[in-house]
Amino acid sequence: MKVYTDIFTRDEFLSDSYPM
């Protein structure tokens, strides 16, 4: 589940740059 967590974390981090 490391990959899933990594993607989720990246999504939150990127969300700060471009809020969906």
Curated annotation (Swiss-Prot):
It comes from Naegleria fowleri (Brain eating amoeba). On the 2D-gel the determined pI of this unknown protein is: 5.1, its MW is: 20.9 kDa. Pfam families: TCTP. Residues 1-20 form the TCTP domain. It comes from the Eukaryota. Belongs to the TCTP family. This is Unknown protein NF040 from 2D-PAGE.
